[in-house]
Curated annotation (Swiss-Prot):
Expressing tissues: Expressed in anthers and pollen.
Record protein name field: Expansin-B1
Alphabetized PROSITE patterns for the sequence: EXPANSIN_CBD, EXPANSIN_EG45
Domain Expansin-like CBD: 183-264
Family to which this protein belongs: Belongs to the expansin family. Expansin B subfamily.
Sites where a glycan is attached: N34
Record keyword Magnesium present: no
Native source species: Zea mays
Length: 269
C-alpha cells in the first residue's frame, strides 16, 4: 500500500508540473517594453539567433514581414534582422536600425554591427530577441570566425537603437503594391533615414487640399480604401516616430501603375 501511495504522489506531482508549465521545453519569456527613439547610447541585453543561409539575408525570398524585397542587395546588403514584439511593433518598427554586439563568446569581436529590422519573430526566448540574417550573425565574429560563431546557435548579445544612415543621395522610395486601383492604394515605404520607421502616412490627391491619413496594412505597407476614385498625382506626407515630417510632393504620378517604384526627392536628415 505504501508503494502504491508513493506512486500516486509521484504521478500527481508530474501532472501538477505539467499543468504549471503548460508544455515541455524552455519557459516562455514575456516581451520587454517597446523600444523607442530614446537615443541615449545605453546598451541593453538581448538574445540573438540566426536564420536562412549562412551568408544570406535571412528570408528565403530576400524579403520578410515588413514587405521589403531584395534585402540582400544594397543598401541593406543582407544586414537585416527579425525583431520580436517590442522591436517589430506590429510593423511600426520596420526599417528601424540597431547596433548589436556580442562579448561573452571567444569568437565574438565585441564590435557592434548595424542591422535593419525587415522581419518579425515571436519566439518567446527573451524580453528582446533578434533573429539575425546569417550574414549579420556571422559579422559579430572576429575575422575568420564567422562560420564558427554561427554554430553557437543562441547567443547573449547587447543592443541599442541608433539612427539609420544611408549612402549619400539616397532618398525615400515608395512602391505601389500589386492589385492597386483608383479605389485601393497600398504603398510600401523604404530607405527612411534617421528613425527609420514611420508612424503615420498621409496622402493628398490632385482633387483635394486635404491630407488624408492612410491605414497601416501590414509591415511597412500603408493603404487607402475609398469609394471615390483617387486621382493622381499624389503627394505623401510621412511622420517619423520622433515626430519629424517630410512631404514628397507629387511623388506618385497621374499615370501611376501597380507594382511600380517611385523615388522621392526627400529624406529625414
Amino acid at each position: 500500500m505504501g508503494s502504491l501511495a508513493n506512486n500516486i504522489m509521484v504521478v500527481g506531482a508530474v501532472l501538477a508540473a505539467l499543468v504549471a508549465g503548460g508544455s515541455c521545453g524552455p519557459p516562455k519569456v514575456p516581451p520587454g517594453p517597446n523600444i523607442t527613439t530614446n537615443y541615449n547610447g545605453k546598451w541593453l541585453t538581448a538574445r540573438a539567433t540566426w536564420y536562412g543561409q549562412p551568408n544570406g539575408a535571412g528570408a528565403p525570398d530576400n524579403g520578410g514581414a515588413c514587405g521589403i524585397k531584395n534585402v540582400n542587395l544594397p543598401p541593406y546588403s543582407g544586414m537585416t534582422a527579425c525583431g520580436n514584439v517590442p522591436i517589430f511593433k506590429d510593423g511600426k518598427g520596420c526599417g528601424s536600425c540597431y547596433e548589436v554586439r556580442c562579448k561573452e563568446k571567444p569568437e565574438c569581436s565585441g564590435n557592434p554591427v548595424t542591422v535593419y529590422i525587415t522581419d518579425m519573430n515571436y519566439e518567446p526566448i527573451a524580453p528582446y530577441h533578434f533573429d539575425l540574417s546569417g550574414k549579420a550573425f556571422g559579422s559579430l565574429a572576429k575575422p575568420g570566425l564567422n562560420d564558427k560563431i554561427r554554430h553557437c546557435g543562441i547567443m547573449d548579445v547587447e543592443f541599442r537603437r541608433v539612427r539609420c544612415k544611408y549612402p549619400a543621395g539616397q532618398k525615400i522610395v515608395f512602391h505601389i503594391e500589386k492589385g492597386c486601383n483608383p479605389n485601393y492604394l497600398a504603398v510600401l515605404v523604404k530607405y527612411v533615414a534617421d528613425d527609420g520607421d514611420i508612424v503615420l502616412m498621409e496622402i493628398q490627391d490632385k482633387l483635394s487640399a486635404e491630407w488624408k491619413p492612410m491605414k497601416l496594412s501590414w509591415g511597412a505597407i500603408w493603404r487607402m480604401d475609398t469609394a471615390k476614385a483617387l486621382k493622381g498625382p499624389f503627394s505623401i506626407r510621412l511622420t517619423s516616430e520622433s515626430g519629424k515630417k517630410v512631404i514628397a510632393k507629387d511623388v506618385i504620378p497621374a499615370n501611376w501603375r501597380p507594382d511600380a517604384v517611385y523615388t522621392s526627392n526627400v529624406q529625414f536628415y
